[in-house]
Amino acid sequence: MAPPASTLTAPVTAVPSVRTRGTALVLVGILLVALNLRIAITSLGALLEEVRTGLHLSGAMAGVVTTMPTIAFAAFGAVAPWLVRRFSPGRVVVAAMVALVAGEVVRVATGSTVVFMATSALALAGIAVANILLPLLVRQHFPHRTGLITGAYTVSLTAGASVAAASAVPIADAFGSWRAGLGAWSVLAVVAVLPWLPAVLRGSRAHAATAPLTGRVRPARTRVGWAMAIYFGTQALSGYATMGWLAQLFRDSGYRPQTAGLLLAGVTAVGIPVALAMPALAMRLGSLRPLVLSLSAMMIASYVGLALAPHGGAVAWVALLSIGQGAFPLALVMIGLRARTPEGTVALSAFTQCLGYLIAALGPLVVGTLYEITGGWRLPIGFLIAAALIQTVAGLAVARPRFVED
């Protein structure tokens, strides 16, 4: 059963007005935290060959490095609800960013493979916890602007990932070391801590970021929890598979490597305005069903096009795929829409993302295996279409007006 109405409304009424300086700092803090959530991953991906050479990593160890993010997101994200209950969202965010800074700094200062892996895991732990907290922070501080703020931080996350991927190699070349290309980004993580310090140091009970949450919600015992996790997981599976293999598909269809890379970059570029608009649109519509169905339809149409005419219609398929991947920001805003309380939000966020990233880890692996077995793209794309159909069913279940606390 849902908690009494007084329990549901108290956290929101304690939140300061959007016009106050404290809430403005929280907004800046949310955007800066989001900016850092993929930088440590994409910068390492861009410099993986240089890191392998510098640390003498085997192919197997390099494979572990590339699979660590999804595993870490699932494993470390699970502790976020406990941390928030024991401490507070603001304090946990600061601790997460400190862990990210420590991991980013130490891993570029070591010559040990073991230390590099351990500190990379530390950085990913900070990212994993922050992943879980952002929907909660948006819900607490911007209950009437959830869609707009979710879209804004999704764009910030995407921009950080793209800029780091594009800039890591030039920075490394400019300083003559891959360590500079990885370590330079720790400055941004330090900056992300600053907006949270006034509230955390002051410890004001009136500030929602410093109030520990009480109570416990168990999404694993609810249908909406499982539907959310499956929806998030299948859309992330498609996203990771696309990022890992789309350029290769275009190269196999006859495009030059540079053009294939530009087409892949186009998925991200077109996706930025989609990410900004999708959460706000979700908040304005009376039902989520039209968005779930339209996004899945575009994704499936793109996959069919890639299977039948990857070269001739590449630009159209990229555009459809970019819009279809608007399921990611939609999933983030769904977390807030399917919880009544801050406790429910953080619990649903943790369950959704932990299980979802485990599902997502299968995407590149299964697509790569099917590609290696068949030597073509029809069967891998068939797998992605099946995932999109499952995503649709789960999304329609989430679209039903019910809550994780029910």
PLM feature segments, named:
Residues 42, 70-78, 162, 268-276, ...:
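Residue-level signature of mid-helix packing/kink "hotspots" within the transmembrane helices
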Residues 44-45, 223-273:
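Extracytoplasmic gate region of multi-pass secondary transporters
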Residues 56, 88, 109-114, 143, ...:
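Helix-breaking motifs and short loop linkers at transmembrane-helix boundaries and internal kinks
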Residues 75-114:
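Conserved MFS/SLC helix-loop-helix module at the cytosolic interface between two early adjacent transmembrane helices
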Residues 121-155:
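Cytoplasmic helix-loop-helix junction between adjacent transmembrane helices
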Residues 144-145, 152-204:
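Helix-loop-helix hairpin linking two adjacent transmembrane segments in secondary transporters
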Residues 288-331:
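C-terminal transmembrane helical hairpin of 12-TM major facilitator-type secondary transporters
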Residues 339-377, 383-384:
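A late C-terminal transmembrane helix in Major Facilitator Superfamily
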